[in-house]
Amino acid sequence: VSQAGEEVDRPVSAKEIALYDDAAERDFAWADLRSTVDWFRTNRVVVAAIVLIVVEIVWKAQFLSHLYFRQDDFHDLDLAIQSPFNWRYVTYIGAGHLIIGLRVIAWVMVRTSLYNWGLASAISLAFVAAANLAMLRLLRMLFGTRPAILVPLLIYAICPLAMPDLGEWSSALESVPLQLALLMAVHAHICYVRTRRVKHLAAAAIWVAVGLVFFEKGLVVPVLLLLLTGGFLAAPRRTWLGDMVRALVRCWRAWVIYAVLMAAYLVVLAQSLHTSTTHPSAPNSAGAVGTFVSGLLKDSFVPGALGGPWQWLAVPGGSYAFAAPPFALIWIGLFVAVVVIVISIWRRPVAWRAWALVIGWVVIADMLPVIFSRIGAFSADVLGTETRYVADAVPVLAIGMGLAFWPLATDQTRKPNTRRAHGLRARTAQQSLEVAAGLVAVVLFGSIWSVQAYKNVTSGKPAADYIANASAAIKQAPRGTAVMDSAVSGDMVEGLFGSYALQSIVIGDLAPGKLRWLEHPGGTIDGLHMFGPDGRLYQAKVRGVASEPLQAGQKCLPNKNGRTVVHFQGSSPSKTGIVRIGYVWFSSSPGYVSVSYPGGTRDVAVKPGLHTAFASIKGSVSQVVVRSLGGGAICVGDAQAGNLEADQTGPVIPAAPS
C-alpha cells in the first residue's frame, strides 16, 4: 500500500517473468509454423516433385475417364475369365507377347468384375505413381536433390508418347510395370556398383525378373545396365567399349546373374511360342524397314520427346489414334533435337554416351521386335506412327537427358570458382538457363496440347455404353433366350481375334449360360433375338424379300401333296444366308420338313403348333419349296429370305430412353 493509501502491484521477479513467458510460448506453440516452413524450405525439391506427381496422377485419371477397353483388352479379359489359373494360361502368348504379369492381374481382376474400367484404370495409375516415385528416387541418387531434377521428372510425367499406351489397358500393363522395374533395377544396380553389397545385387536381379514377367522388352534392361555402368559409373577413359569391358570384369557377378535370368526367360519364351499367332521372321523388304525406322523417329519419338505430335489420326470409331504431326513441326522438332544434342555435347563431351543410351534402347527394345514380327503383316507407314512402341523409352529419355546435362552427384566434388562465375561466363550461363526454361515451357505446353488433341479425337463412350446396355440386357432377358451370335463392332474387337470377337464371348462372358447363343440358326426357333449396335437386345428380323401375301380367305399358302411352293416378291439379295418360315405343324409330335432352293436342300426340325423356323441357304432365291417329310402336315403362313438383323422398331431390352 502506498503512502496515499493506494494499492500497488507487487514487484514481479525475473524468475516469475520467465515462467510466464515459457507458459505463453507453450500455449501458442501449436501456431508456430516456423519449423514447418523450415522443413518445406529444406525439402522444397522433394515437395515440388510430390506435388508434380499428384497433379500428374489426377491429370491421367481424368484422361482415362473418357476411354474404355478395346481390342486386346477384351481378348485378355475374356481369356482370363475362361481359363483356370495354371502355367499354360499365364504363358499363353497370343498376339506375340509373353505377358505373365498381365495374365495374373487380369485373372484376379475379372473374378471381381469382368469389364470394370474404373478398377482397371486404378491399377494402371497405381503403377504410374510407383514408377514416378521410382524415377524421383533414381534422379535424387544420380544428381542429388537439386531443382534441376524436376526437369527430367516433368518430361517423364507429361510426355505424350505414354498417353495412348496408358489408354489401352493391356498395353499399359505391359509398359508401365516394365518402366517401374527398369527404374528400380537401375537404382539397385548403381547401389551395387558403388557398394558391392549383395542385397543391392539381389534387389537388382529381382527387378530385372519383374520386368521380364511383364514384358519381353525386359530382356534389354541388363543391356541398359551394362551401357550405363560402362558409360557413367566409372571414370571415363579412352573409349566407351573399353569402359564397358572394365565394367564387365569389375561387376562380373551381376552380369552372370542377369544372363541366367535372361536365359531362363528365353527358354520359357521358346516353349510358349507355339501359342502365338505371330512368329519372328526376317523382314522381306529393306524399304519397309527404312520406312518404319524413319517414321518411328521423325513422326513418333522425336516429336513426342518435345511435347508432340500435336495432332492425331483417329481409327474408325475413335477408340485410338496414331501420331500425325504437321509436316513443318516434324522438321522443326528434328532441328531442335539436333541443337539440344549438340549443345549438351559441347557443354559435356561425355553427353554423347547419354544420347547413344537413349537411341540404343529405341533401336533394340522398340524397333527390332517390330522389324522381326510386324513389318511383313502391317503397313510400315502406319507402324511408324504407333507411339505405343516407344512409350517404354520415356524413362530412358529422362535418364539420358539428365546424364547429358549434369554430372553425377558423386562427381560434384569441386566447388565452383566464384571469380570465373562473373562476367561473360555468368551472363552466358544465365542466358542458357533462360533458353532452357523457355524450351521446357514449350514442351510442357505442347504436351498438354497434344494430350488434349488426343482426347478430342478419341472416346471410349461407344464401347462403354455397349457393354453397359448388354449387361442390363442379360440381367433382364429370360434365361435361355435364343440369340443370334455375330461379331461385335470392329472398333471394339477386330475379326483378327477370331472367336474372341464374337458377341457370345464378349457379351456372353458377362453371364455364362444365361443366353442360348446360335451361330447358324436352324430349325424351329421362337423369339430369336439379336444384339444391336448399341448393345441392346432386339428381336431378330430378316432383311430381304417377303413371300407373296395370302389371298383373301386363305390361312396357308397352297399345299399340294405335302408340298408348298413359296413365291417371294422378287429375288432376294445375292448374299442371302437364311430363310424364315412361319408355320403350323399339324401333329402331336415333332417332325421334319425339307426346304429346297436352287442351291440345295435343308432339313428343318418342326414342332406341333404355331412356330417360326429358320433354314440356312446361300445365294439369291425367288422361291423355295417346303415339303413334309412325314409324320404330319405343315401350313406355311409366310416367309422371308435374306439376312438377319436387329429389329430396332420393335421391343428392346433394356428399354431405350425416350
What are these regions (language model features)?
Residues 191-209:
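Short hydrophobic alpha-helices at membrane interfaces in multi-pass membrane enzymes
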Residues 150-156, 203-208, 355-363, 436-441:
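Central hydrophobic cores of alpha-helical transmembrane segments
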Residues 349-378, 439-443:
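Transmembrane alpha-helix segments characteristic
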Residues 137, 184-191, 225-230, 258, ...:
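Transmembrane alpha-helices and membrane-interface helical segments
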